[in-house]
Amino acid sequence: MVGATTPAHAADLTAGYVALEMEPDARFPFISGIVEGIAQTRARIDGSETQTTGCIYHWFYEEEKSYDNILAAFAKFQDRAPGAIVDALIRRRCDA
């Protein structure tokens, strides 16, 4: 499979890799997938309460600098998991 992530490669998929080595056209879809996963998890946890999920979507898709802030955090914490960094930024912004 071309482009498949194997367990050996998954360990190398650090925030630094995403920020510095991943093809620029692949970064946004990859990061938006993380955001969508976190938002959907919050939606399941929160049930009919949609405030946190709405905050997540607003933060990522509508706030001007959210994507740039994510990339800056990835560059700063290069050895961390991308999902953990996005989750921390969401928790800080949306009190999730």
Enumerate the language-model features and the residues they cover:
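Globin-like tetrapyrrole-binding proteins
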Residues: 34
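Compact alpha-helical subdomains of small soluble proteins
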Residues: 12-17, 24-25, 40-96
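Sec/Tat signal peptide C-region and signal peptidase I cleavage site
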Residues: 5-10
